[in-house]
Amino acid sequence: MAIPKHSLSPVPWEEDSFLQVKVEEEEEASLSQGGESSHDHIAHSEAARLRFRHFRYEEASGPHEALAHLRALCCQWLQPEAHSKEQILELLVLEQFLGALPPEIQAWVGAQSPKSGEEAAVLVEDLTQVLDKRGWDPGAEPTEASCKQSDLGESEPSNVTETLMGGVSLGPAFVKACEPEGSSERSGLSGEIWTKSVTQQIHFKKTSGPYKDVPTDQRGRESGASRNSSSAWPNLTSQEKPPSEDKFDLVDAYGTEPPYTYSGKRSSKCRECRKMFQSASALEAHQKTHSRKTPYACSECGKAFSRSTHLAQHQVVHTGAKPHECKECGKAFSRVTHLTQHQRIHTGEKPYKCGECGKTFSRSTHLTQHQRVHTGERPYECDACGKAFSQSTHLTQHQRIHTGEKPYKCDACGRAFSDCSALIRHLRIHSGEKPYQCKVCPKAFAQSSSLIEHQRIHTGEKPYKCSDCGKAFSRSSALMVHLRIHITVLQ
């Protein structure tokens, strides 16, 4: 059921809602004292924007004074001495983006005080996902029947806001839920700004609606039970008054708790593990790890993902696109992270260092695998025989012993192998390649293990020792031949 538009509080980005914003001289005095908090800075920036946008030609004595006054107001808002061109551009884009939103969404997003267009877009995405689940149609207009006073009923004034957007209310009860804890200084939805040093008197063009005769200090400054009391709304009919908090519950409207809770530091807490996050999108992505929700499905293969960005990365597998190219060698990659990892081959950068032995690695995954050498951790266990491994690739190769799978085949002779490295070593037989060179003599080998055995000739090392007679050997194969002597004697 839709509702009349007048049940929504006007917001700063509705140009037809505001006539004038007056800010008392205490603002300059308080700002000169320095040490603005983040909340005070946002309030000051919004007040400056409103003064600039609602300046009237009649306030100046002439065109030159009007132009100079506008220029000064613009500088107070955009602060070119403190902001770069990109930051100023971001402010302008953010304002235009908020102004282009549907009024219902615009009111809620504006209350969150987004600092950038990207942050505002994330907030819109979060809200629309919740509303989509409720079956809300942003293009639907309120019907005449839904707006009739007789349909609402005098005994149920909470129906005015309770039915907005398929049951998700953006009315006064939602305002209270969006406020910082312990704060009655700021109305979370109406867009009005309250600071200790700034007093704003806001007058609206609209001549109808629930707030037309309500003083500003009664709309946003009440706290506790007095916020929605009858004395706070003396000029409203019973149908226009905001719903009492005991008749409306935000949890009931959503069906669950709200997606995240607004606070002064914009931090959110996971209900499952109590972990804190700085943004709504980060919290929602984290919560999907508990519920294992994967709403983003690939139309090609049906694989589902918890984030739309992960789906976009996956779809490159089907398209074969590799837009990220290395400027050094021309090799292309489907993901920018893969390009970054590849570029470390050219730069020699190894930013990941082991705290135990100091060894460095170019990839974080390589460091994680290496650290298991120190911890002895072997998290990957074979279901067939129980043997455990420190790396998943080693487990995969081992499992082929049980399955008999040999997916790597030599094109020259047709011989098949269970792992890729074995095929590479085999291919050197056909190519004659011997990449492992002895530093003492000019002899070269096709396999690194053969080079290690050869180097023992120069070093004299004999690590393989017979437990029966104590004789030592440089190769394990030589020890096996020697052991047969003892076996023959015993027989």
Curated annotation (Swiss-Prot):
Compartments where located: Nucleus
Biased composition (Polar residues): 225-241
Zinc finger extent (C2H2-type): 268-290, 296-318, 324-346, 352-374, 380-402, 408-430, 436-458, 464-486
GO CC list: nucleus
Disulfide bridge positions per record: none
Pfam families: SCAN (PF02023), zf-C2H2 (PF00096)
Region (Disordered): 134-161, 204-249
Keywords: DNA-binding, Isopeptide bond, Metal-binding, Nucleus, Phosphoprotein, Repeat, Transcription, Transcription regulation, Ubl conjugation, Zinc, Zinc-finger
Basic and acidic residues bias spans: 214-224
UniProt crosslink position (Glycyl lysine isopeptide (Lys-Gly) (interchain with G-Cter in SUMO2)): K443
A Gene Ontology molecular function term of the record: DNA-binding transcription factor activity, RNA polymerase II-specific
Modification sites for Phosphoserine: S9
Alphabetized Gene3D superfamilies for the sequence: Classic Zinc Finger, DNA breaking-rejoining enzymes
Domain SCAN box: start-end pairs: 49-131
GO biological process, one term: regulation of transcription by RNA polymerase II
PANTHER family found in the cross-reference section: ZINC FINGER PROTEIN, ZINC FINGER PROTEIN 771
Family: Belongs to the krueppel C2H2-type zinc-finger protein family.
Function: May be involved in transcriptional regulation.
Protein's name according to its UniProt entry: Zinc finger and SCAN domain-containing protein 22
Organism field: Homo sapiens (Human)
Phylogenetic classification of the source organism: Eukaryota, Metazoa, Chordata, Craniata, Vertebrata
Gene behind this protein: ZSCAN22
